[in-house]
């Protein structure tokens, strides 16, 4: 698979442009190669994000240069390894948040905080986890090692929310 490499320069001030570009590249799933140089696989779902980043750099008065790296086995292997390492770090962070979510539900049960407002809040938290899962899954082209565990943990979180919801509704039925 060919890769796109973006190298750019931005004016030193204001720094918000540099931060915005950095955030956009991270959100896109690009991997940093060195300061001001990032890489991502060529094609969907990365093309639109790269175009947006290039526009942001240009609008901020910067100079973007985009190169397409041929599907060279040695380079591709190194880039795939960096890319998968980045996705693995994202999955690890996601798994930690799944653990926090399950702990939060257990704490609410222990406190007897079984209200509809709390249920709504926990549903929103699960929706956030689902959005995050989809975003990482979309970028994880090479199947990072923790992807399957993340899928299982998200299902566990959904099941934990169902059990919490059952308790909330049972608590509402009590006089």
Language model segments and positions:
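Alpha-helix boundary/N-cap detector
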Residues: 89, 93-96, 117, 124, ...
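Positively charged, polar, low-complexity stretches
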Residues: 1-106, 131-134, 138, 157
